[in-house]
Amino acid sequence: MTTFSEKEKIQLLADIVELQTENNNEIDVCNYLKDLFDKYDIKSEILKVNEHRANIVAEIGNGSPILALSGHMDVVDAGNQDNWTYPPFQLTEKAGKLYGRGTTDMKGGLMALVITLIELKEQNQLPQGTIRLLATAGEEKEQEGAKLLADKGYLDDVDGLIIAEPTGSGIYYAHKGSMSCKVTATGKAVHSSVPFIGDNAIDTLLEFYNLFKEKYSELKQQDTKHELDVAPMFKSLIGKEISEEDANYASGLTAVCSIINGGKQFNSVPDEASLEFNVRPVPEYDNDFIESFFQNIINDVDSNKLSLDIPSNHRPVTSDKNSKLITTIKDVASSYVEQDEIFVSALVGATDASSFLGDNKDNVDLAIFGPGNPLMAHQIDEYIEKDMYLKYIDIFKEASIKYLKEK
């Protein structure tokens, strides 16, 4: 029994794909969803981050238990649209695939949750408790929307949280954090013909980087026991088991130097240079440890010439991989997906859960699970399989009913 036809479900997704929310303008999706919820007498509220960025919260049912369903409304930049086979901000159906920016990451998952909420309400299928939909702004960068909702207490009373990021057949109970660490070196600019009276910031930065590589290598040799196991995820993505050595490396802390800047012209000694790292913290080596790790190296080199800035700081998230929510989704999904394709794993990426759960994480059942192939995220010609999009609506409905009934 459904409220929406297949054609209507696809059109609802098409409507929000057309709303261009490239790292901004989520307010347009909020207004669209507010009108949709009003049509079905579902109470909702828009909470602004700023003039153009906002969240929307909608709720059905009452009392406990409370299941939160979440998805983000922002998408990454479409890049050069001439490189797309189909217009990125117009849903195109072709050979069983729905093309468009955000179809996989993650307007497909978000609209599946919205339809779930409406159909459960319209069909009076909620056995007990509350379902709270949290549609967020700014997940792709700083998680501003999730932080706002957490600060306002929207996660304080939840028992379970489903984040419908594209996971295919994977069900994730935990993930690493994500930190952006920028190290800046300062020196003294002079003409390059007299470098001895200046101070080359690049030299200081290289000294830092060489010591960083040495210390990081030593740390990885000690990093052998992990709470998070990401091996099942990699097996699914590459189609085979990865080696124990690779699994150990991937499940631990990782740090990558991804941006380097220094110098403005060839005949001047640079007075500033910087390195930017993306670090993926884990429970054993958390964000506080990472900050101290960088600062200690800076102190060893020269704290008068080096400084550390952390513009992005998201913590790792853990939960029980055998929780009621995980087992419920696994049981329900097995009726729609081949049993041997379903797996439970930790995730190497980060989600809004980092900002949502905070100190409350041990009390919440977490499942990151949604339609879409994660390898399609951020790609040109991004698409979601039509059957998967439609199928996951039914999975979300059944899993929500079962979880609230049995929790």
From Swiss-Prot:
GO terms for biological process: diaminopimelate biosynthetic process; lysine biosynthetic process via diaminopimelate. The keyword Membrane does not apply. One of its GO terms (molecular function) is metal ion binding. Keywords: Amino-acid biosynthesis, Cobalt, Diaminopimelate biosynthesis, Hydrolase, Lysine biosynthesis, Metal-binding, Zinc. Disulfide bonds: none annotated. The active site is at D74, E139 (proton acceptor). Pathway: Amino-acid biosynthesis; L-lysine biosynthesis via DAP pathway; LL-2,6-diaminopimelate from (S)-tetrahydrodipicolinate (succinylase route): step 3/3. Its cofactor is Zn(2+); Co(2+). It comes from the Bacteria. Zn(2+) 2 binds at D105, E140, H378. Zn(2+) 1 binds at H72, D105, E165. Binds 2 Zn(2+) or Co(2+) ions per subunit. Its EC number is 3.5.1.18. It catalyses: N-succinyl-(2S,6S)-2,6-diaminopimelate + H2O = (2S,6S)-2,6-diaminopimelate + succinate. PANTHER family: ACETYLORNITHINE DEACETYLASE (PTHR43808), PEPTIDASE M20 DIMERISATION DOMAIN-CONTAINING PROTEIN (PTHR43808:SF8). NCBIfam families: DapE-ArgE, PRK08588.1. Belongs to the peptidase M20A family. This is Probable succinyl-diaminopimelate desuccinylase. It comes from Staphylococcus aureus (strain MSSA476).
